[in-house]
Regions:
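A cross-family glycoside hydrolase active-site/sugar-binding cleft signature
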Residues: 19-23, 47-51, 75-77, 125-126, ...
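Metal-dependent polysaccharide deacetylase catalytic core of the NodB/CE4 family, i.e.
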Residues: 45-138, 169
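Short, electropositive alpha-helical surface patch
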Residues: 132-146, 218-220
Length: 242
């Protein structure tokens, strides 16, 4: 039995909305292009979270060309993807930073991406490590962002002016420090499909090796061939805040 058979069986039960979010554009460009080529060949959309502080001319040119061709959506991934917390879990926009401190980095990143990509950049924000604070949400709302994309296990934030579209399955997910097996990953995906909620799959191209690319390609083949797959950009799944 194929390791993806649980996913195929779950799709047989009914329609499923699914999106892919790839984080950390700015690191590992060649692997990024390889991932985007996989999606292009399957005619499936992908949202790319771009680190403003890691922009280069070649990254800008490559992403802009692919976004203009269709299927690739671009949005902001923090500012520099650095940890500012003195201890504990990693945050770029964490509890040790005030509204004003966070606003400086978010608006600087926003300006860099707008200068680089113009209207190809969507009003979506993914915080590094999927973590941020209520101050972050307030900054986003005050600076024109419409959507925050974290992880589905993240605690709700107070500011309802920004819609949340979380990822639900981490391709590199683990339990107690041990990476899921392919069959465990397939079961996680199948459970997400059966939930009736949109399925958001988080990828990290920079740590994706040839074997992982082959596995992602196999999943895309299953999704692309199944009539119940409703592949969509992240932004299309946002509810209107308020």
């Amino acid at each position: 039995m194929s390791w993806l058979e649980p996913v195929r069986a779950a799709l047989d039960e009914g329609p499923c909305r699914v999106f892919f979010r790839d984080d950390d554009a700015g690191w590992g460009d060649e692997r990024l292009w390889a991932l985007l080529d996989l999606f292009r060949r399957r005619s499936l959309p992908i949202d790319v979270a771009v680190i403003p502080g890691s922009l280069t001319p070649s990254l800008i040119a490559g992403l802009a060309a692919r976004a203009r061709a269709g299927g690739v959506r671009l949005h902001q991934h923090g500012f520099a993807h650095v940890d500012h917390e003195p201890a504990g879990r990693k945050y770029e926009f964490g509890p040790s930073r005030s509204y004003d401190q966070q606003a400086v980095d978010i608006t600087r990143g926003q300006a860099l991406l707008r200068d680089a990509f113009g209207d190809l950049i969507e009003p979506v924000f993914t915080p590094p490590w999927n973590r941020c604070t209520s101050d972050t949400a307030a900054v986003l709302a005050d600076t024109g962002f419409r959507i925050l994309s974290r992880d589905s296990t993240a605690a709700p934030l107070r500011d309802v002016r920004v819609a949340e579209v979380p990822v639900t399955v981490d391709w590199f997910g683990s339990r107690k420090g041990v990476r899921w097996t392919p069959f465990q990953l397939a079961e996680k995906l199948a459970d997400a499909v059966r939930s009736g909620e949109p399925v958001g799959i988080m990828l990290h191209h920079a740590v994706t090796d040839p074997g992982e690319f082959a596995a992602i390609g196999a999943l895309l083949a299953v999704l692309g061939a199944h009539p119940n797959t409703r592949a969509t950009p992240l932004a299309a799944l946002a509810a209107v805040p308020g």
